[in-house]
Design a protein with these regions (language model features):
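Short alpha-helical transmembrane segments in multi-pass integral membrane proteins
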Residues: 1-21, 79-144, 188-243, 300-366, ...
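N-terminal transmembrane alpha-helices
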Residues: 9-46, 59-74, 78, 103-110, ...
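Transmembrane helical elements of multi-pass membrane transporters/channels
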Residues: 19-38, 140, 174, 203-207, ...
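Hydrophobic alpha-helical transmembrane segments in multi-pass membrane proteins
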Residues: 24-32, 69, 101-110, 144-149, ...
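Helix-terminus/linker motif at the lipid-water interface of multi-pass membrane proteins
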Residues: 33-51, 121-128, 184-191, 253-284, ...
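Small-residue-rich hydrophobic transmembrane alpha-helices
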Residues: 51-111, 148-167, 274-338, 370-392
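Hydrophobic transmembrane alpha-helices of multi-pass small-molecule transporters
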Residues: 63, 178-183, 208-212, 283-287, ...
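Short runs within selected transmembrane alpha-helices of multi-pass transporters and secretion channels
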Residues: 72, 140-159, 170-178, 196-209, ...
Length: 442
């Protein structure tokens, strides 16, 4: 890495892009590992039913927490653009405003979560022990929801503040705490789903509070948390900018709930457990795409504000090349690791292992395509074009995935559910390419 600090105003080669975005990529991976570690310990130390319960209720928690990603991506794009225009005072005002607004939203959403948790679990078909385990896991996590929202938000804003390495440090600290506490609460104390939830909640508190302390004190970053004046226009622009990421996260969670309903119909609890393994691995693999998109977004927004369109075109071209290489590597890894990763989670049950390994082999084809749609949506957000970004996110999840998961099983039964994920990503890439070409022609 270069000894000279990388700045948003720099010219970015592929090497410099990797250097700048690597902390964001690692940061998002560690966040994804929270769920992966929970799943590993619950599955191997508590059994299939608690594991299925965790997988069943996680989409509800992700929907509530995704407001943090909306504020982080939407606000980060607006802050970076404002700094590119040279107005650092207004950039700091917007930064403080969105942090306070997101914290307030987190409190309100946590209260809402306690009201809807049981009805949502019942709606997805949970009953008996499956229902009780899901409620235990969900309620404990809801206590920490405001901190989860802040953690999600700061993952984006650290890059905007030109402090991606500090963001990585905070996320790694929270992730390590989660792993250690999971081993203690679930592996040693045998607290099951409750222990996994407590470990996650504590780690989210670490990830949310540490950035607050840093930005509230004098620091060497571009941003400082302090008093702010209400700016409804900036708040509205933040929400509209980040609406695509919010919609994408909410839609993916709703789609996961629909997948769970379909899997209960075609394969029962084993189907949900197999899908859970796929989602855990997918979160880590796709975290590379999400992390890159989060890391490069403030660069794109800055050069948009500075009206450096030549650099913007270069960033897009180099990003697509890097994503293509990464997609091929992840597909190859998915094919090779299908059996070992399935065995890691469900090796104790031969039937479930066979189902999961088979599903993984089909599902890994989605890695060839998913990164381009993720980046495409983020690219338009960085350009402050929230509408196009939202359309891509909406089509990718609520149209393509819902349509595929409802129709494909009619033709191919259980395999149709796994194939539907791949088909949806292919259609999303085609849609993204159309929007990018249209933007280039304009």
């Amino acid at each position: 890495m270069s000894k000279t600090p990388i700045q948003l105003s720099d010219h970015f080669t592929c090497r410099k892009l990797i250097c700048f975005t690597l902390p964001s990529i690692t940061m998002i991976i560690f966040t994804a590992i929270y769920g992966v570690v929970d799943g590993f310990f619950v599955s191997n130390y508590a059994g299939k039913t608690p594991f299925a319960a965790v997988n069943l209720i996680i989409p509800v928690l992700l929907i509530l927490g995704s407001v943090g990603f909306m504020f982080g991506t939407g606000g980060g794009a607006l802050i970076a653009k404002t700094m590119g225009q040279g107005d650092h005072q207004r950039a700091n005002n917007i930064f403080s405003l969105i942090v306070y607004a997101s914290a307030a939203c987190g409190v309100v959403l946590a209260a809402l979560g306690f009201l809807i948790l049981r009805p949502a679990a019942v709606l997805m078909g949970a009953e008996g022990e499956l229902l009780e385990q899901a409620l235990i896991y969900g309620r404990i996590n809801l206590i920490a929801l405001p901190f989860y929202v802040l953690q999600y938000e700061f993952q984006c804003l650290f890059a905007t503040a030109e402090k991606p390495r500090l963001g990585l440090f905070v996320t790694v600290a929270a992730g390590v705490a989660n792993m250690v506490l999971d081993a203690l609460f679930v592996g040693v104390f045998s607290w099951g789903a409750a222990g996994a939830a407590a470990a996650t909640a504590i780690s989210q508190c670490i990830g949310g509070v540490a950035p607050l302390v840093y930005f509230a004190r004098p620091n060497s970053s571009l941003l400082r948390l302090g008093k702010c004046r209400m700016d409804l226009r900036a708040l509205g622009k933040t929400c509209s900018n980040g609406s695509s990421e919010f919609m994408s996260n909410v839609s993916m969670s709703l789609v996961s709930m629909l997948y769970n309903v379909q899997l209960m119909k075609y394969a029962g609890e084993d189907g949900i457990s197999a899908y859970g393994v796929l989602m855990y691995v997918s979160m880590v693999f796709q975290a590379i795409f999400v992390g890159y998109s989060v890391g490069v977004a403030p660069i794109e927004s800055y050069h948009l504000g500075a009206e450096n369109h030549r650099e913007l075109r270069g960033l897009l071209r180099r990003s697509l090349g890097l994503l293509a290489v990464c997609a091929a590597c992840m597909f190859a890894a998915g094919q090779v690791l299908a059996a070992p990763l399935s065995r890691l989670y469900v090796g104790y049950d031969p039937g479930l292992f066979e189902m999961t390994s088979h599903a993984f082999g089909i599902f890994s084809f989605s890695f060839l395509f998913s990164g381009f749609a993720i980046y495409g949506s983020s690219f338009f957000t960085a350009l402050n074009d929230g509408l196009t970004s939202a359309i891509i996110a909406f089509l990718r999840t609520l149209v393509f995935q819902v349509g595929a998961v409802l129709t494909f099983p009619l033709l191919w039964k259980l395999d149709g559910i796994w194939l539907s994920i791949v088909a949806a990503e292919v259609m999303a890439v085609i849609t993204t390419a159309i929007f990018l070409l249209a933007k280039r022609m304009r």
